[in-house]
Amino acid sequence: MDIRQLRYFITIAQEQKITSAAKKLHMAQPPLSRQLKQLEDELGVVLFDRNKKKQMTLTYEGAVFLKRAKEILHRFEDAVIEVQELKEEVAGTLAVGSTIYCAALMLEKVTQIKERYPHLTFNIWENEPATLLELLESRQIDAAVTTTLIKSDTVQFKQLDDIPCVLVLSDEAGYPCGDTIKMVDIPSFPLILLRPVNGKGVYNQVMNEFHRLNLEPRIVCECHDSATLLSLVSSGFGASILPVTMIPVHMRNHVHTVHIENNPFIMTPAVMWRTDSYLPKPAQQFLDLF
């Protein structure tokens, strides 16, 4: 048994079909079938139920072996990375993610680390907190910046400074507004609100606060995409209530941010990372920036 056979087995378990696994592994189907048979013969157990026509499902023994095979493969990959990183130069790939509200904060750090280590490549995700946690635990990303803390035995958090939300307007829209605004005055503006798929986040906070104050907001658009929302705001389509960290650096000269008096919209971001495996040097350098 070797690492290559473990990779084959894990891929078959993920794809649930020999043909799909062979295609993903860039090899022919017969050699892959032989490798699986050799592995089963060596272990003395059947790893897959082959009686089902559409897909191969793991037997009980196969499910137990899959868990251990993944652990072994991850440890092997960690060892390879750690040895390779004994070189002084920081290189490789930095895989990180963030929620839509922390995107600008994350990208600011990514830009800093890119300037410091020009040989790095990047894999960047934007998603919901629960999905980011899954990506961390499945080792698809090394770190994430989020506004919602989800408990996990394999992930550690570092809370960052509070982030206030602000009213964001286009400089060219001509809305009469100073540097501060009261909540009771916000309904006079056409609002574009970001509404995540799961319905949580700033959207719920804003709607609950308007309801508490018996105010009727003038909502002209509910947007499910952060890039589209920012484009609409900068074009003068309407105003929005957003965390300041969500506004990209290149846009800050083209929009006007207005502080909300007695601000009820405060977010506490955190950076999170895995604790049950080796943390690649690029990820360590990324976390050091927070």
Swiss-Prot record:
Q: Does the keyword Transcription apply?
A: yes
Arranged from A to Z, the UniProt key words for this protein are:
Activator, DNA-binding, Transcription, Transcription regulation
Q: Which InterPro entries would you find in this protein's record?
A: HTH-type_LysR_regulators, LysR_subst-bd, Tscrpt_reg_HTH_LysR, WH-like_DNA-bd_sf, WH_DNA-bd_sf
- What range does the record give for the signal peptide? none
The record's listing under Gene3D superfamilies reads: 3.40.190.290, Winged helix-like DNA-binding domain superfamily/Winged helix DNA-binding domain (1.10.10.10)
Q: What processes in GO biological process is this protein linked to?
A: regulation of DNA-templated transcription
Query: Which residues does UniProt assign to DNA binding?
Result: 18-37
| Gene Ontology molecular function terms on file | DNA-binding transcription factor activity; sequence-specific DNA binding
Q: Does the keyword Transcription apply?
A: yes
**Where does the HTH lysR-type domain start and stop, copy by copy?**
1-59
Which Pfam family is one of this chain's hits? LysR_substrate
Instruction: Report which superkingdom the organism of origin falls in.
Output: Bacteria
How is this protein annotated for GO cellular component? cytosol
Q: Which family does it belong to?
A: Belongs to the LysR transcriptional regulatory family.
Function of the molecule: Could be a positive regulator of bsdBCD expression in response to salicylic acid.
PANTHER family the UniProt entry points to: HTH-TYPE TRANSCRIPTIONAL REGULATOR BSDA, HTH-TYPE TRANSCRIPTIONAL REGULATOR YBHD
Protein name per Swiss-Prot or TrEMBL: HTH-type transcriptional regulator BsdA
Q: Name the species this protein comes from.
A: Bacillus subtilis (strain 168)
Question: Which gene codes for it?
Answer: bsdA
